[in-house]
């Protein structure tokens, strides 16, 4: 934000030096990033008069001039053609240093001596462009420094504002802060509007179809305007704050924008169909040409200003080429409105169109100042463009905004800041900020915040206001009063750390992905319309469309991370993430947020090495990782059942992980189409476990059992079972016998083919026996083994081979 000292002084009485004012603003939280003096160091540029002008003898385009500076008459060579003898001009005398470090010296130009230079506005830093030298008013005294004579000496402050301080995006806003700090009252500009003629309602009609995005829309009608250049004072004031003069009408809207901080827009009323304004959302795919001549494609979420037939402006951002102010414009419809900040931000960001107007609406304009800014601009247009303001004002304001009231505790504020201010002292500070207060009871105040302070919502915000206005430098340094507790992790945190250590120990790298995802990510996962993970929590104002909803699964984030790494030629990946997902609960305001452990594997089983075979990962590798996790948390009795519920897995190459009736998660190879959708062209294996359920299924640590001192013995069984019988059912059947001497049972061979009937498979199981009391003999093992065989035959329909 750029402000000038002279402009600030119009609203607040202030005699601080430039340095003092800069320090004051910075201590108020308005950081001064730069200070520039206008006219500083230009005391050698004075008012002079051209006594004589004649042609240069050696150059057709140069003139020899006799110039009187009030003390002496100097010879000056000048190339400008826009002056005559008798004109008062700006003379840069010998020794003057102009902007750009241009030093004026005595010189000879085409053989003639020149003892100075007649200056243009551009050469003095008063304008970006100029034609010829400055011609000054005839009543200015000779020899007086130019910037003193014209009152142009000024100081420009460049202020870096934080996004929450929308109220300071104006000269009045900054002046209000200065007045509050100095304990003075701000003087607002007068804006008495002289109205005449027909009422405005007979000149124009305004319809707001979307009051949610446009809570307030006001307008005035000014007829008989004459478009032309703005007066010098207005041009210079705009240029001082970095704005280019266009014409008197546009300059007035820009002037009020910088003065009040509220954007306005002027339409050529004769170009509006039926003199009608309709505020509504754009048609999806609509093409609209803005003032900069660019064609922009709109969406149904963009708010537009339309006339009776077409869009004429992008609400709060930029006007349209089809209704702009032209040299022939005579009748003007002047708009002053309040638009929803989120809607303006989304449209401006999507279109890549950032303007002074959108900058202010995005941060939150003042809905209460709409008519004041409108009247100020209308009064200036009547004065500077000769317009006639129609009687009345159109004000569409269906639901007036109420002032926010915040409960404030004096003791709490003192405790937080380490100060000792009384309630009356704090109330005085609030009154300086134009807040109103009501004492509810001793030490408790209800503070009503004006609408221009959209950033104040909670008690702590008011505490900050007290700190700012009372002075950060008045807060004494004290030791914090706090009880120190040891930072012991909770049991849940210890389990999370243990899980991460386990995954790293298995060769995985932890990744942290965004908690948001694109809605299209679920389509790329091929989830069906009835899948609960499609019921997402949407963000009201996402930063980007790719992060518009909260994630319901960790898979998209891991796949995108894998895709990026594969593009970098990291072909062997093991990634995991232990984070929350967000599942919408019907009838609940907040989603369920379970903690989920997910892992992704792709590439080779072992790192590249001279002694390692290049075995690719397969289903059993990812299953082994899940088994290791379950073992680490002492989850016993886990089962793996084939299940094609999750369509993002390869059919027949996935399973559901259960502990009893509790579903812990799933694992398997991803569907090739899902891999393609994420730009991956090699097999990917994935698992996902609900960490909360995993912990609930975990057993308490069991007592240490010393290993047996006696040798083991084993027996192998080869059986035929149905093709769909999981091998895990065989092991589970043996474990279910609860025979104390059975140490372990494991499948070591699987065979299908010759001598095995269709629909059957041959599985070999090794059962290991051991006693903790003695060495088992064959006679003791045989009956135990027979029980195993009988159980397999009875429960699984197995045939012994």
Swiss-Prot record:
Q: What reactions does this protein catalyze?
A: tRNA(Phe) + L-phenylalanine + ATP = L-phenylalanyl-tRNA(Phe) + AMP + diphosphate + H(+)
Binding of Mg(2+) occurs at 455, 461, 464-465
Designated name of the protein? Phenylalanine--tRNA ligase beta subunit
Q: What is its EC number?
A: 6.1.1.20
Similarity comment text for this entry? Belongs to the phenylalanyl-tRNA synthetase beta subunit family. Type 1 subfamily.
The segment(s) forming the B5 domain are 401-477
UniProt domain FDX-ACB: residue ranges:
708-801
Keyword Protein biosynthesis included in the entry's annotation: yes
**Which HAMAP family does the UniProt entry name for this protein?**
Phe_tRNA_synth_beta1
**One Pfam match, by short name?**
B3_4
State how the cofactor is bound. Answer: Binds 2 magnesium ions per tetramer.
Q: In this UniProt entry, which cysteines form S-S bonds?
A: none
Record-annotated tRNA-binding domain positions? 39-147
Q: What is the lineage of its organism?
A: Bacteria, Pseudomonadati, Thermodesulfobacteriota, Desulfuromonadia, Geobacterales
What's in the keyword line of the UniProt record?
Aminoacyl-tRNA synthetase, ATP-binding, Cytoplasm, Ligase, Magnesium, Metal-binding, Nucleotide-binding, Protein biosynthesis, RNA-binding, tRNA-binding
| Gene Ontology cellular component list | phenylalanine-tRNA ligase complex
Organism, by scientific name, is: Geobacter sulfurreducens (strain ATCC 51573 / DSM 12127 / PCA)
| UniProt superkingdom | Bacteria
Q: Which GO terms describe its biological process?
A: phenylalanyl-tRNA aminoacylation
Tell me the subunit arrangement.
Answer: Tetramer of two alpha and two beta subunits.
Q: What is its main location?
A: cytoplasm
């Amino acid at each position: 934000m750029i402000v000038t000292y002279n402009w600030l002084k119009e609203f607040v009485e202030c005699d601080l030096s430039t340095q003092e004012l800069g320090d004051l603003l910075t201590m108020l939280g308005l950081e001064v990033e730069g200070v520039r003096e206008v006219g500083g160091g230009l005391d050698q540029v004075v008012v002079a008069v051209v006594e004589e002008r004649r042609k240069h003898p050696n150059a057709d385009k140069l003139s020899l001039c006799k110039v009187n500076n009030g003390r002496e008459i100097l010879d000056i060579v000048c190339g400008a053609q826009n002056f005559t003898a008798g004109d008062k001009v700006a003379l840069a005398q010998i020794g003057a240093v102009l902007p750009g470090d241009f030093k004026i010296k005595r010189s000879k130009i085409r053989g003639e001596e020149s003892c100075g230079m007649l200056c243009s506005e551009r050469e003095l830093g008063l304008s970006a462009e100029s034609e010829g030298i400055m011609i000054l008013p005839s009543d200015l005294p000779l020899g007086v420094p130019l910037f003193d004579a014209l009152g142009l000496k000024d100081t420009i402050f460049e202020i870096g504002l934080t996004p929450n301080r929308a109220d300071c995006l104006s000269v009045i806003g900054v002046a209000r802060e200065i007045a509050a700090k100095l304990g003075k009252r701000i003087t607002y500009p007068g804006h008495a509007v002289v109205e005449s003629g027909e009422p405005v309602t007979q000149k124009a009609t305004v319809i707001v179809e979307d009051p949610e995005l446009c809570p307030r829309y006001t307008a005035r009608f000014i007829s008989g305007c004459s478009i032309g250049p703005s007066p010098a004072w207005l041009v210079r004031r705009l240029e001082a704050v970095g704005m280019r003069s266009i014409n008197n009408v546009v300059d007035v809207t820009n002037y009020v924008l910088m003065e009040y901080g509220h954007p306005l827009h002027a339409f050529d009323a004769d170009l509006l169909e039926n003199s009608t304004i309709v505020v509504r959302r754009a048609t999806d795919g609509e093409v609209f040409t803005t003032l900069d001549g660019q064609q922009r494609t709109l969406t149904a979420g963009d708010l537009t200003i339309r006339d009776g037939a077409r869009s004429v402006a992008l609400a709060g951002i930029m006007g349209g080429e089809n209704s702009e102010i032209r040299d022939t414009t005579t009748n003007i419809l002047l708009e002053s409105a309040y638009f929803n900040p989120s809607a303006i931000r989304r449209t401006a960001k999507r279109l890549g169109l950032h303007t002074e107007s959108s900058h202010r609406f995005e941060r939150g304009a003042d809905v209460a100042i709409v008519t004041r800014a409108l009247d100020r601009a209308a009064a200036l247009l009547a004065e500077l463009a000769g317009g006639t303001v129609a009687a009345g004002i159109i004000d569409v304001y269906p639901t007036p905004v109420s002032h926010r009231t915040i409960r404030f505790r004096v003791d709490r504020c003192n405790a937080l800041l380490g100060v000792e201010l009384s309630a009356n002292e704090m109330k005085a500070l609030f009154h300086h900020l134009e807040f109103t207060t009501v004492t509810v009871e001793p030490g408790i105040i209800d503070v009503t915040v004006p609408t221009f302070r959209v950033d104040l919502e909670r008690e702590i915000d008011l505490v900050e206001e007290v700190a700012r206005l009372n002075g950060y430098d008045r807060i004494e340094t004290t030791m914090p009063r706090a009880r120190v507790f040891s930072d012991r992790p909770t049991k849940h945190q210890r389990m999370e750390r243990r899980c991460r250590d386990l995954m790293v120990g298995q060769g995985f790298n932890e990744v942290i992905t965004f908690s948001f995802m694109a809605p299209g990510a679920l389509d790329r996962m091929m989830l069906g319309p009835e899948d609960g993970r499609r019921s997402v929590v949407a963000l009201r104002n996402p930063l980007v469309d790719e992060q518009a909803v909260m994630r319901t699964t960790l898979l998209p984030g891991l796949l995108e991370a894998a895709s990026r790494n594969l593009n970098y030629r990291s072909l062997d990946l093991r990634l995991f993430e232990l984070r929350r997902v967000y599942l919408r609960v019907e009838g609940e305001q907040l989603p369920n947020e379970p903690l989920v452990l997910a892992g992704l594997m792709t590439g080779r089983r072992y790192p590249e090495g001279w002694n390692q075979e290049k075995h690719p990962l397969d289903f059993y590798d990812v299953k082994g990782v899940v088994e290791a996790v379950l073992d680490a948390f002492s989850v016993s009795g886990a089962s793996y059942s084939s299940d094609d519920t999750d369509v993002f897995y390869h059919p027949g190459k996935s399973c559901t992980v259960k502990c009893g009736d509790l579903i812990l998660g799933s694992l398997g190879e991803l569907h090739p189409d899902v891999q393609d959708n994420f730009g991956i062209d090699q097999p990917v294996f994935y698992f996902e476990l609900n960490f909360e359920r995993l912990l609930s299924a975990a057993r308490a640590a069991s007592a240490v059992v010393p290993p047996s001192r006696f040798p083991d013995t084993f027996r192998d069984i080869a059986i035929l079972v149905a093709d769909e019988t999981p091998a895990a059912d065989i092991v589970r059947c043996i474990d279910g016998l609860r025979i104390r001497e059975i140490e372990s049972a494991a499948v070591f061979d699987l065979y299908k083919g010759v001598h095995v009937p269709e629909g059957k498979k041959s599985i070999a199981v090794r059962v290991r026996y051991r006693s903790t009391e003695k060495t088992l003999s064959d006679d003791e093992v045989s009956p135990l083994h027979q029980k195993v065989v009988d159980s397999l035959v009875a429960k699984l329909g197995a045939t012994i081979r």
